[in-house]
Amino acid sequence: MRFRFAILTLLTLAAVSDAAAQTNTCQVPDQMKKEQKLACVRVGSFMLDQPSLTPTQLANGPDFDAADPEKSRFAYFTAADNIFCYFRPHYAFMSVKGESMKFQCWHMTADGAFYSPTGEIIPLESVKVVIKTHKDGEKSASLYASNDTNNEHEIKVDHFKVKYLKPPYPDHNTRYNEVFTEVAASRIMWVLGFPADHVYPVGSAACIGCTADPFANNLKDNQASLKDAPNIFKIVSAERETPWEEIKPEGDETWSWSDATKFYADGEWTHQQRVEYDAYRLALGLLHYHNAIAQQNRIACAQWAPNTAGQPRTCQKPMIFAQDLGSTFGKAKGSLDLFGTNPRGSFSDWESQTVFTDPHTCGLRATLEGDKQVLKEAQDLMIHRLGRLDPQTVRAIFTEARFQTMDQKQLRRLRDSGSQNPEEAALDEWTNTFLKRIQEIKSALNCKEK
């Protein structure tokens, strides 16, 4: 029986490799319309090659370069880091900006210089922010030296997104537990070989030009001097998007789960794409990701064909994935809770949210608008990939994401029950429950054959 399972797994993995080797392309013209991006979703992929990570790589995150740790040090962050930055107006220009407390900022050194996108130091005495309006109507902020009168030489500076808590930790609203959950969710996706943004735990962020609540204040400019005192945000996360270029016709880089369901059902997707889609839904089920809304999704190009003069660009490897994984490790709000939000980073809410409603029929709890049952090949593929999530790795991910301090309700319960080390006990609960989720996927019965 074990031999038969091993053969089936190898055949599934071979099919994955063969399908990955085939080039599925889509054209991306300069004046691309929103409806044209469906061609890229139709040939898109949900999966990457699964990485083999050392404990150091896992702890430092995907932007850490083991071959050159010092050079990559600016690119990744840890919970011990206190980062410095200059506010970059961004979310005030978005039509749908979400609810999580966040801002973008340009990366600075502790002594007031800037980092380039590749980590070189850029010393500047004084800067100015210029807001530009693009052809698609979108606005973006650029950085210039103050004495660049005609704005001729934009300064390319490393930048990233910061999410913060409100009120400050530990009395924060649990709606903003994305500071913790997104770190864990993105690391788990990375280990499993699914695309995700690069999210890091950070001790604090000192932001010049920020108010105490820049997201709520809807800041549209930054006229601060580099010598001004920063606002300091404690217990935050820093997020870098994937290095791929978004496919963004008319300013819209999203895709919908309903389109994915249609392509899955009507045969427009290959069998391999259907396997990837179901494997991805299983992976998201581990976290209880249930938000099937297009604005949280992104389509990007991981590989472009060489340009041909006069012809539209061709994407050789379109990737489709959920970009915002913050609403995880909780559950959906109640149907009568019209003005509430989905609990996230809440152990008591997440504990009951199993991957399957019925493991005997392989029926997903969070279907994401797709078929309730998943393919047996997707289950086999996930069983193989889940081998990288052993107990030590799972615990290390939750520790790095600071799950031991996230859920104050959980910690109070553990203290009241007499725990001598409630933070370690909290990690035990998160880890053991996640391992049960893994076992669910391994032991589920009657997944569909095709």
Regions found by a protein language model. Name each.
Residues S95-K97, K135, N173-T181, H271-D278, ...:
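Extracytoplasmic/periplasmic, Sec-exported soluble proteins
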Residues A21, E35, A80, S100, ...:
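Disulfide-bonded cysteine motifs in exported proteins
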Residues A6-A15:
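Bacterial N-terminal signal peptides
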Residues D81-D252:
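Conserved ATP-binding subdomain of kinase catalytic cores across diverse folds
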